[in-house]
Amino acid sequence: PGNNGTAVLVPVPPLSEERRQELNKFVHQLVEDGRIAVRNVRRDGIHNLQNMQKDGHVSEDLIKDNELEIQKITDSNIEKLNTLQDDKEKEILEV
């Protein structure tokens, strides 16, 4: 470690190929957990809508419209996760 008077400088060695692969696996697992969470929210939302329909609070047309909207939001969020994963993997593998 070095000291330039105002900051402590700590040299960090470059990542090895093995460590890069480990980080990629970690990123992949985090993104997969995110996808699962998004799908669980979708499932819960659709389940709640169906319960509302069974109770007679909401019409079938409104249920279908909201299910489609929930699916669009789900697809959008999963696409964002995929984009983030691709960007991060490229960043990690960059030498």
Tell where the protein language model's regions lie, with residue ranges.
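Positively charged, low-complexity, intrinsically disordered RNA-binding extensions
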Residues: 8-95
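Short beta-strand
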Residues: 1-3
